[in-house]
């Protein structure tokens, strides 16, 4: 079959002085950073949905891209053609992983039976593509938000039959992820929230969502899936309010249903922006709570109130993010998935490469700066000094539960405490 991107062999590293827009300037997969190859640190993934499924339509205009696999035709044949192009792209871009929703890779069909049969055929296609290319699956997931049946949510839907249909999709998508050697399975509740409280039973919907997640965990163990389960927080859009608002909110939810040791987080930069947080904040919070799993690398726009899913371009912001990740030991099953799309005006097929190359170079340079921060150690030293009082006898007695509130009041009076503020620098 003729290559779709026939004017490009593979994207290669040419160094920071290169003027070639189809070459890496900072991402050198084999370069050692803190003793580990850059490729192993970053674990780049390209997403199926924005890259190959979006046709360029928006709220005010029809599709603008005119991709060959988005034309009228036999659905499975078009899905196979899309897979051909996707894996050509992954290979030429030098990404190690990819990610998908079930209906990104397979036609949904007109019934559950058609959905399951179509997906089974496409899983075999994807398995062959993975074997041929060496590209692996970072994570799979089920799209339980696009079809009109999910207008009022999936797990939080008032109708248990919709809940059951969603369960079928998750079972099928998780088993497909398992068969394809996926390293994670993601749960994003696009419509697990509400439009108005006037027709919403918050307690009921929370109980439904909690039970659904418990069943997901049960099924993971039943089929022997060794990957990580990930929830992806987002505060709103398409609903007015989503129940997985941010990292801290999800932690409270997981604790309530006894799932905090079973599920971790997939943090997206743009979702942090929508929640009123920095990307750095959400990563640091997930790490502090022991829930850090993976990253959707993109960016939003602080002046816009929706999910713009732009490619990351801030080395400063992402150096701080990579610094936190390196300090925490780096990725295990997770990675950096580019949940990002070209703009509607970017109709040239090679624009897909320009966007990803710039993003990969941004994250690579951010990694190198973060590594220098680790090696320098100055920031860690200052933080350790700032909290050094907690290593004292008093600090340790407080933390170990050896002093009560009344004990501390007595201690403060007996020692005539008069602490002086120390600069935070």
Curated annotation (Swiss-Prot):
Homotetramer. Mg(2+) 1 binds at residues 232, 268, 296, 339. This is Xylose isomerase. The keyword Isomerase applies. The lineage of its organism: Bacteria, Pseudomonadati, Pseudomonadota, Gammaproteobacteria, Enterobacterales. It is found in: Cytoplasm. One of its GO terms (molecular function) is xylose isomerase activity. One of its GO terms (biological process) is D-xylose metabolic process. The active site is at 101, 104. It comes from Shigella boydii serotype 4 (strain Sb227). Mg(2+) 2 binds at residues 268, 271, 307, 309. InterPro entries: Xyl_isomerase-like_sf, Xylose_isom_bac, Xylose_isomerase. SUPFAM superfamilies: Xylose isomerase-like (SSF51658). Its cofactor is Mg(2+).
